[in-house]
A protein has these predicted regions:
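Bacterial Sec-dependent N-terminal signal peptides
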Residues: 1-46
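Glycine-rich beta-solenoid repeat tracts in large extracellular/virion proteins
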Residues: 78-84, 103-111, 130-136, 156-162, ...
Length: 247
């Protein structure tokens, strides 16, 4: 029998003594933790039975169904989100934010396309290394849209690499140490970058506000805010289409 307090399992009755005797504590503990997110379990084993207390905290990003993540609470550790054989679809809800003192804020990895959507201006993204690292190694498009500030304290604000079809980035204020926005598209489609705020890197001669390399079709960069760094914009189009920069 399960006893609940405030909707959470608090104890199991002594009638589970026979079960306790026939399975290992590790196996039973794992079974009890199914679907528990970051559960903290304290178990006392004795002749009277089993006492289990569970305290859990919601993860910033929850996956349901496969490949679909919704991030809704503040997080201070790297969120590594991935999908294999299906689109990686990440949505940032109001109330979420990401601030890490080690690593990247968000690591996005897929082989069938990636879509990242943050329509919330207060859902800031700050990583000790990079703000957003996105890598699509297979088919499909890579798309990043964020209306909040994105900061990479040591490396990139946004770093996106695509091997599928098109790569598109639509970003508000973005700051990196070496590069504000770094985009590389080896896919078959276009590379498009749109910025609506300041895009900046540090002022060393080796830094770049926006760096874009395309091997697909068109390369288009449109900025409505300032773009700063040792170099403002560095764009290389080795694809079959046009190169267009509008500031």
């Amino acid at each position: 029998r399960l006893t609940k307090w405030k909707g959470k399992v608090a104890s199991l009755s002594p009638s589970l003594g026979q079960l306790v005797a026939t399975v290992s504590p590790i196996a039973l503990g794992r079974a009890l933790l199914i679907d528990a997110n970051r559960a903290l379990v304290a178990a006392t084993w004795g002749g009277a039975g089993l006492l289990v207390t569970v305290g859990s905290a919601s993860a910033a990003c929850v996956e349901t169904p496969d490949g679909v993540f919704v991030c809704s609470v503040p997080e201070t550790t790297t969120q590594s989100l991935s999908a294999t054989g299906t689109l990686l679809d990440v949505t940032i809800d109001p109330g979420a934010s990401f601030t890490t003192t080690a690593g990247n804020a968000l690591d996005l990895t897929g082989n069938a396309g990636i879509t990242f959507l943050n329509n919330n201006t207060d859902a800031t993204i700050t990583g000790d290394l990079s703000g957003i690292e996105a890598l699509n190694t297979g088919s499909g498009a890579l798309s990043i849209t964020t209306k909040s500030t994105t900061t990479g304290s040591s490396v990139y604000g946004i770093n996106a690499t695509n091997s599928g079809s098109s790569l598109s980035i639509n970003a508000a204020g973005t700051t990196g140490n070496s590069v504000g926005i770094n985009a590389y598209n080896s896919g078959s489609g276009a590379l498009t970058i749109i910025t609506t705020g300041t895009t900046a890197a540090n002022t060393s001669i080796f830094s770049t506000g926006i760096e874009a390399n395309n091997n697909g079709t068109d390369l288009t960069i449109t900025t409505s805010g300032s773009t700063r760094g040792g170099a403002g914009i560095v764009a290389t189009n080795d694809g079959s289409g046009d190169l267009s920069i509008t500031t």
